[in-house]
Structure formats: structure tokens, C-alpha cells
Amino acid sequence: MNPTKRNSHAIVEFVDVLLRDGAVIQADAIVTVAGVPLLGISLRAAIAGMTTMTEYGIFDGWDADHRRRNAQP
Amino acid sequence: MTPAQSQARAQLSDGRYVYCVVDTTSVPSASVGETTGIDDETVRVVSVDGVGAVVHDCTSVYDADDIDQVKRWLVTHQQVVDDVSDVFGTPLPMRFDTVFAGGDSALTDWLADTHPRLRTELDGFAGCWEYRVTLLWDPQPFEAHVTATDDTLQALEARQAEADAGTTFLLEKQYDARLAERRRARRSALASDLSAAVEPVATQVASQDTTTSLRDESVSERHTPIARLAVLAPETDESALGSQLDDIAARDGVTIRFTGPWPPYTFAPDICTDEPNQA
């Protein structure tokens, strides 16, 4: 099987990952409030029903872009 | 937004939103292309000695009560990371909403201070991507097989047919317990088999909680996620990884979800300016 980035579960996956993972930089110049990342748990919990994102056309450009890439040899 | 966050937004005059760090050794920083950033901001690369931060200029952090707005930011963030990955190769991805204060000078100071560490991380991830694998299991085919073939279950069923009401109740409890035991063993075996299948082609594997913080409407009621792995693997081994997963997906009741290639979000380290250089 081949991996996908376009299905609804892939979208849920990446949003979840993007909000939770990635390198966290600890440096004086990083903007935080009392050392706490600004975007926290409450926002993650609030984002539900990611598959409805497609209904807003949010992914149209991204989808087209990836289809084009996947079509390349 | 809390009062403290409002204050932070108000104070930020020369911010740099950082998407990721890339290797600019062999590709000029100016090659970032036509990708546009969050809120259509211009994306550029601030580079120090072959290590570049992909940024846009900003005057606030990104937080909003409008969830659709946040979703658009997230998708655009990923889009930018995808675009620059095409140019520079595997990036070191930052968590969403990583913002530096102090303009390019603060950013170049940080790049210089952490340069050996960033270089090591970029070299370590070069040519590798993160793939995510979820094993979903519908236990019904397994239960049908087990109830027809398990000697203990068969014996309990036979005894129930001849027992009084009180005994039948106890036998039913034993039956359920035995079935649950077989189900648990099967789940455990499937999870182990999945780990064993990806291990030969993985550079690193991280086992993750089977529940996401987001609701996934695409999961059917009958399918239970029983294993979730983040797999760091060379791009050249993507097909081999897919083949390994085919073997697991062929089993009764099993559905495999295979997504990627993603930047190595799960495997990206926390980077502290004060830590000793690891180069």
C-alpha cells in the first residue's frame, strides 16, 4: 500500500500532530507567556470534526497541489 | 484569549513566525519559490552558514476563537512546510505558532548559537520522513472464529444448555471472561506483529496513544484503533514499508491506515539554547 496525505483521516492526523509535536524551541526570544506555549490544550480540544474542513474548501488548493505532485514520475 | 496573551500580542512588533529549519548548504536561501504563508504573508529563509529558518514577518502570535480560522492557519502552515521540503529536503519542523521576537537579528543570533545542534539534527533526518500507521480492528470475524473453535468456550456453552438459571448466569460470566481474554490476546498479538513488521525498515519507531485529541468521524463504530505508530524511515524504503503493512492489512478484521510522508514532527527534538552543543 502507499501512504496518503489527502484522506480525511490523514487530515485529522496531521492537525493533531502539528498541534502536539514538532520541535519546541526554548530561547529567550521565543514568544511565550510565563514559559507556556500560547496555543494550548484548550484549543486542541475545541477543534473537532476535522472532516468538515473539506466542506469549507480549505483543502481544495492543497488537494490539487498534491494530486499534481503524485502524478509526477 | 487570556489577558496575558493579549498583552503578548500587543507587545510583539517585529516577530518572525518560524515554520521549520532547513539545510541551505546546496540550495540558495532565495529558492523558497512562490509559496505564501499564513494570512498570505511572504515566506523567506533567514540563513546562517547553511542552516536556514523558514519564516514570515509577523506582529502577533496566532490564536483565535474562530476555529475555522485556526484550521486554515494549520493547513497553510503544513502547505509551506511541504513546499519548502520540495526545495530543501527534509526539514526540522517547528511546532505550530513558534514565534520569535526581535526581528532577523534575534533569529540569526539563535541560529548561530544553536548551529551545531541544528546541523546535527538536519543531517540526521536527511532523506527520512515520518510515516504514521494506525491499526484498526473489527473483532467480529475473530470472535466468530473463536466461538466456533475454542474448546473452553464450546465446553462452557454445552454446560449452559443443561444448567439451572443460577449456574447458567455464572457460566455466562465465565464465557464472557474467556472470550475477552482471547480478544485481548489477539489485540496484543496484532500490535506486536505490526511493530515487528515496520521495525526492519524503520530508522526510529514511536508508539503512540491510540486516541487522538481530535474527533475522527471516518472511524467506524466497529473498528477499534489498537495500535498507532510514528515511523521514521528513509524515503527510499517507503514502498518496502507499504509492502510490510500489506501483510498485516490482509488479516481478518484489520484495516491499516498509512499516512505520510510527513516532516519528522514526532521525532523533532526540543531545542534549548543553553544546552551543550552535541556536534
Curated annotation (Swiss-Prot), chain A:
It comes from the Archaea. PROSITE patterns: GAS_VESICLE_A_1, GAS_VESICLE_A_2. The lineage of its organism: Archaea, Methanobacteriati, Methanobacteriota, Stenosarchaea group, Halobacteria. Transmembrane segments: none annotated. It holds the Pfam family Gas_vesicle. The keyword S-adenosyl-L-methionine does not apply. Encoded in a 14-gene locus called c-vac which produces cylindrical gas vesicles only in the stationary growth phase. GO terms for cellular component: gas vesicle; vesicle membrane. It is found in: Gas vesicle. This is Gas vesicle protein M2. One of its GO terms (molecular function) is structural molecule activity. Belongs to the gas vesicle GvpA family. GvpF to GvpM interact with each other in vitro, and may form multi-subunit complex(es). Might interact with GvpA. Induction: In PHH4 (a deletion of the p-vac locus) transcribed in all growth phases, maximal expression in mid-stationary phase. An unstable 6kb transcript able to cover gvpD-gvpE-gvpF-gvpG-gvpH-gvpI-gvpJ-gvpK-gvpL-gvpM is detected, as well as smaller transcripts. Gas vesicles appear earlier when grown in static culture, possibly due to O(2)-limitation. The keyword Aminoacyl-tRNA synthetase does not apply. Proteins GvpF to GvpM might be involved in nucleating gas vesicle formation. A minor component of the gas vesicle. Gas vesicles are hollow, gas filled proteinaceous nanostructures found in several microbial planktonic microorganisms. They allow positioning of halobacteria at the optimal depth for growth in the poorly aerated, shallow brine pools of their habitat. Keywords: Gas vesicle, Plasmid.
Swiss-Prot record, chain B:
It is found in: Gas vesicle. Transmembrane segments: none annotated. Its main location: other. One of its GO terms (biological process) is gas vesicle organization. GO terms for cellular component: gas vesicle. It comes from the Archaea. Keywords: Gas vesicle, Plasmid. It holds the Pfam family GvpL_GvpF. Induction: In PHH4 (a deletion of the p-vac locus) transcribed in all growth phases, maximal expression in mid-stationary phase. An unstable 6kb transcript able to cover gvpD-gvpE-gvpF-gvpG-gvpH-gvpI-gvpJ-gvpK-gvpL-gvpM is detected, as well as smaller transcripts. Gas vesicles appear earlier when grown in static culture, possibly due to O(2)-limitation. InterPro entries: Gas_vesic_GvpL, GvpL/GvpF. Encoded in a 14-gene locus called c-vac which produces cylindrical gas vesicles only in the stationary growth phase. PANTHER family: PROTEIN GVPL 2. GvpF to GvpM interact with each other in vitro, and may form multi-subunit complex(es). Interacts with GvpC, GvpN and GvpO. Proteins GvpF to GvpM might be involved in nucleating gas vesicle formation. A minor component of the gas vesicle. Gas vesicles are hollow, gas filled proteinaceous nanostructures found in several microbial planktonic microorganisms. They allow positioning of halobacteria at the optimal depth for growth in the poorly aerated, shallow brine pools of their habitat. Expression of 2 c-vac DNA fragments containing 2 divergently transcribed regions (gvpE-gvpF-gvpG-gvpH-gvpI-gvpJ-gvpK-gvpL-gvpM and gvpA-gvpC-gvpN-gvpO) allows H.volcanii to produce gas vesicles. Belongs to the gas vesicle GvpF/GvpL family. This is Gas vesicle protein L2. It comes from Halobacterium salinarum (strain ATCC 700922 / JCM 11081 / NRC-1) (Halobacterium halobium).
